[in-house]
From Swiss-Prot:
Gene: ompA
Organism for this UniProt entry: Chlamydia pneumoniae (Chlamydophila pneumoniae)
Protein name according to UniProt: Major outer membrane porin
Family to which this protein belongs: Belongs to the chlamydial porin (CP) (TC 1.B.2) family.
Highest taxon in the source lineage: Bacteria
Membrane topology: Multi-pass membrane protein
GO cellular component, one term: cell outer membrane
Length: 389
């Protein structure tokens, strides 16, 4: 049985190292009991059943570095089934689009192309009886998200009638032939959790853990790449809780009523894992169930534009003449995409369950170094180093 357990753990660790990497780290279930001697103070092996034992024997502290690097979190859009905007244009005649209609939301359950999240933090754990850890991390995180333009509700107004765009005109086309990507700044992040060695048999340990993490970075750069509306905004600002039509000064540098684009990241996780100690090396394999959300309050960001036209243009949108050879002077804005905007929707985990493989290297029962890979619900790697006081 012991040989079989060794083989299974080593095979899983090898497969994880050569496969793809991917929620929060599960960690080694043996962590609470690996470092039994202190770097500064000598460790005490307290027995909770000993009537002479004190809390000084029961409690110890560990600290170290915590690095978690998610290369591809599998996310989808959390949005309603309908989206309120102008009616879909039909035929070749221009028209005014001032009445809102509920149309099928192209962002509903849309899958994202890529989502990355990187965290570097300090780690501190309160250990009880060399069996249970209560820990927290304090550090900084930054991220990157990319998806089809429909996942961000990229919309615009096309084929509008008249020599001006009225303040009550609504966007009438959803732009699907594009990509939207955003980069966040590096912001403070924290997490709390608990881990316990629930069952031990010889060199094998079965444990469980729970974690919660949070961060609130601002969007540093927003790039919209589309053949009919292309723009990039540094430190974008937009409108939260504002329905169409957007204010007439939307996109102008001096626009009022805008707020910074901030993403509220939350994640919780529960997991279980099994380890087997081989001298100084402790490989482990585990499973985890996690839920992550990235919520920007559905902020809507307008394409940057000039307050007044220069060379008859307010934004760098191409003309879309189609089969028309002459411009209709009565419909000055009909062949240019107007009032373009995108919305940073709420994103959430598409897959909840994942598999974890990793190993811990222990030195003198005082120091340890852990490397971990996570699969299925994300591709991620985790490294940590810690010592016992």
């Amino acid at each position: 049985m012991k040989k079989l357990l060794k083989s299974a753990l080593l095979s899983a660790a090898f497969a994880g190292s050569v496969g793809s990497l991917q929620a929060l780290p599960v960690g080694n279930p043996s962590d609470p009991s690996l470092l039994i001697d202190g770097t500064i103070w000598e460790g005490a092996a307290g027995d909770p059943c000993d009537p002479c034992a004190t809390w000084c024997d029961a409690i110890s502290l560990r600290a170290g570095f915590y690095g978690d690097y998610v290369f591809d979190r599998i996310l989808k859009v959390d949005a309603p089934k309908t989206f309120s905007m102008g009616a879909k244009p039909t035929g070749s005649a221009t028209a005014n689009y001032t009445t809102a209609v509920d149309r099928p939301n192209p962002a509903y359950n849309k899958h994202l192309h890529d989502a990355e999240w990187f965290t570097n933090a300090g780690f501190i754990a309160l250990n009880i009886w060399d069996r249970f850890d209560v820990f927290c991390t304090l550090g900084a995180s930054n991220g990157y998200i990319k998806g089809n333009s429909t996942a961000f509700n990229l919309v615009g107004l096309f084929g509008v009638k008249g020599t001006s765009v009225a303040a009550n005109e609504l966007p009438n086309v959803s732009l699907s032939n594009g990509v939207v990507e955003l980069y966040t700044d590096t912001s403070f992040s924290w997490s709390v959790g608990a881990r316990g060695a629930l069952w031990e048999c010889g060199c094998a340990t079965l444990g469980a853990e729970f974690q919660y993490a949070q961060s609130k970075p601002k969007v540093e750069e927003l790039n919209v790449i589309c053949n009919v509306a292309q723009f990039s905004v540094n430190k974008p600002k937009g409108y939260k809780g504002v329905a169409f039509p957007l204010p007439t000064d939307a996109g102008v540098a001096t626009a009022t009523g805008t707020k910074s684009a901030t993403i509220n990241y939350h994640e919780w996780q529960v997991g279980a894992s099994l380890s087997y100690r081989l001298n100084s090396l402790v490989p482990y394999i585990g499973v985890q169930w996690s839920r992550a959300t990235f919520d920007a309050d559905n902020i809507r960001i307008a394409q940057p534009k000039l307050p007044t036209a220069v060379l008859n243009l307010t934004a760098w949108n191409p003309s879309l003449l189609g089969n028309t050879t002459t411009l209709a002077t009565s419909d000055s804005f009909s062949d240019f995409m107007q009032i373009v905007s995108c919305q940073i929707n709420k994103f959430k985990s598409r897959k909840a369950c994942g598999v974890t493989v990793g190993a811990t290297l222990v030195d003198a029962d005082k120091w340890s170094l852990t490397a971990e890979a996570r699969l299925i619900n994300e591709r991620a790697a985790h490294v940590s180093g810690q010592f016992r006081f």
